[in-house]
From Swiss-Prot:
The protein VP9' may be produced by suppression of termination. Its main location: host cell. Keywords: Host cytoplasm, RNA suppression of termination. GO terms for cellular component: host cell cytoplasm. This is Non structural protein VP9'. It comes from Colorado tick fever virus (strain USA/Florio N-7180) (CTFV). It is found in: Host cytoplasm.
Length: 602
């Protein structure tokens, strides 16, 4: 986060002026104080070093205190101010807590700081300019006097959160540099000022033009708005939550090359190969390029001024790639809870020219939407013409230990089916039971906590065709199915999104009152397999008027991804059961009609 301020470009970033092109309501969706504070804490720890400690001044949330304990260590954190999580809301209707005014005894703060050991390790962070008084109930102390004390007595780093309109009570601190605050709200831009040692703090009074003229009145919605697919803030947050690769390498006493080779050896990948050379050309300055190949993975062409730097960057990129794919306990505990790591998403379709064509294109479009909202660790969208290849790919990925995200893995597998036989465009067939059994076995020996597989296939019943009077479930009339198919053809993609959100909210109401599962099914390695089509029915695919494709499995997977992030392992079955009724309603208009079958393997 430190140093990102110069990356802001008001000419290209979407912004809000006082009467801008986005409403304040849309801008407010960018506001996420939990992520903002989490990124700030991790940034300060990365910037000021592994031995740094935190002294937070101002208001704070309980979850911020929890994150600080996790990042700095409970014995290295001090919060002085007001915990807003303990305040009652101002009204019963809005539930908005009032913004507290933090009053602090300045003499007490100076005494507290003078008693600290290892003062140079403490980061003094001013979250909001608190109201200082000479003593409890005494006369107010000007902020200028507080800054003066910092410049004379504070030996550790200082970070100050500053408003671009008012500064810090019209004082404008400066130091080692400024940085951009992510996930802020409305049309006010806030930035941070940091200084490596408090004694180097300087400030100016009155109007200033270093930062204010550059950013006043702007709100960078592209950087934190789900409607626009995430953006800069989301990317920074994902990067912040990843493993701190350089520090881990140093702690293990390994070079970058040794760390990559060790990971490759532990996870049975082929030996990494480095290729480097001098870039041919007639420029005065010599350039070198390098890349690393390890198994199926290859880094980009890294170009640098020296051969050593190019090789180091290539090894570092490969190490980052492997760290993203390989999940271990150390990486798992970097999140504040299991839901920080939602696992993986696989969207697989068996298709060829004229045979289920376009299914993967729709799935790829949908995967971007899901990743923006849900943030899976890995997302794979695969199109195979052969049923053999699709099943082999899925079973290999599920059973490989190196992809054990310790979270849920959600799979959508789409193929042609006649009765209980799976098929592809080349005449290859397998029984559905055999395929399910193989997928269940692969999921159990892999590293995922849970695997949810949605099979997108037709489930026509030969028994119903031959002996309709002995049918186990009643048919839905063809004209009913055709009618709802026409409705979906007229639906636009935004209308589908609206259906998705409404269904998610209604589903949560049903899941919350449902039964929690306290059986061994909640243990690690459980595989749930469900069918998008109910027994005896064909699946229906429609192309909407706007060109996008709609089919049951994609809608159900999208709904499941949004739901499962809210619930633990003991409510997975309820989430599947309740959400299936909303998918059925899209097909036949009635949630209760038909069957729901879920095959669970432990």
């Amino acid at each position: 986060m430190f140093g990102y301020l110069q990356l802001i470009n008001p000419t290209t970033d979407i912004y809000i002026k006082d009467y801008g092109n986005f409403s304040g309501i849309v801008a407010h969706q960018a506001y996420d104080p939990v992520r903002r504070d989490h990124m700030l804490l991790r940034s300060m720890k990365l910037h000021f070093g592994p031995n740094s400690k935190l002294l937070w001044l101002g208001d704070f949330h309980a979850i911020t205190l929890s994150h600080a304990n996790m990042i700095f260590g409970a014995s290295s954190v001090g919060f002085k101010g007001v915990n807003v999580s303990t305040l009652p809301p101002d009204t019963l209707t809005t539930g908005i807590r009032p913004r507290p005014v933090v009053t602090m005894d300045f003499a007490q703060l100076k005494g507290f700081y003078s008693d600290l050991a290892q003062k140079e390790d403490y980061i003094m962070y001013f979250h909001d300019m608190v109201k200082f008084v000479s003593q409890t109930g005494g006369a107010p102390v000007s902020l200028r006097d507080v800054f003066l004390w910092i410049s004379e007595s504070v030996t550790g780093p200082v970070v100050i959160r500053t408003d671009c309109v008012t500064g810090c009570n019209n004082l404008w601190p400066s130091g080692s540099g400024h940085f951009y605050f992510p996930y802020e709200r409305k049309t006010k831009f806030r930035y941070g000022t940091f200084v490596e040692c408090g004694k180097n703090l300087t400030w100016s009074e009155g109007p200033q033009w270093d930062v204010k003229s550059y950013v006043v009145g702007f709100n960078f919605v592209t950087r934190a708005n789900s409607l626009l697919g995430g953006g800069f803030d989301e990317v920074c947050y994902r990067l912040m939550m990843q493993a701190e690769v350089p520090r881990q390498v140093a702690e293990q006493g390994l070079t970058l090359e040794q760390a990559v080779r060790k990971l490759a050896s532990e996870h049975h990948m082929s030996r990494p190969q480095l290729t480097s050379r001098r870039v041919p050309g007639i420029t005065d300055q010599t350039k070198y390029e390098a890349y690393v190949v390890c198994g199926p993975f290859r880094t980009g062409q890294v170009v640098a001024d020296s051969l050593q730097m190019a090789e180091d960057l290539a090894w570092r990129e490969m190490l980052g790639t492997l760290k993203t794919l390989i999940h271990d306990e150390a990486r798992q505990t970097k999140g504040c809870c299991x839901r920080c790591w939602p696992g993986e998403l696989y969207l697989i379709n068996i298709e060829s020219a004229g045979f289920r064509e376009g299914a993967s294109a729709a799935a790829a479009y949908q995967a971007g939407f899901l990743r923006a909202f849900y943030g899976c660790l890995n997302t794979s969208v695969c199109s195979f013409s052969s049923l053999d290849d699709g099943l082999r790919w899925l079973c290999t990925r599920l059973s490989t230990k190196s992809i054990g995200a310790k979270g849920r893995t959600v799979v959508l597998f789409g193929c042609h089916s006649e009765g209980e036989v799976l098929a592809d465009g080349f005449g290859k067939t397998y029984s559905a039971a055999e395929a399910r059994e193989q997928v269940a076995l692969s999921g159990k020996i892999g590293g995922s906590a849970q695997v949810i597989v949605v099979w997108q296939r037709c489930r026509e019943s030969k028994l119903q065709r031959l002996l309709p009077e002995l049918a186990m479930v009643s048919y839905v009339p063809e004209e009913v199915v055709a009618g709802f198919k026409r409705v979906r053809e007229l639906e636009t993609y935004p209308q589908w999104c609206l259906w998705l959100y409404r269904s998610m909210i209604e589903s949560m109401g049903g899941i919350d009152v449902g039964v929690r599962d306290a059986s061994p099914l909640t243990e690690s390695g459980v595989v749930y397999q469900v069918e998008a089509a109910q027994y005896g029915m064909r699946t229906t695919r429609v192309r909407r008027a706007d060109g996008t494709l709609d089919y049951q499995g994609l809608s159900w997977t999208s709904l499941l991804m949004l739901l499962l992030g809210h619930y633990g392992a003991d409510q997975t079955y309820e989430a599947l059961r309740v959400s299936s009724m909303f998918i059925r309603a899209r097909e036949v208009g009635w949630r209760k009609r038909g069957t729901f079958s879920c095959i669970v393997s432990t």
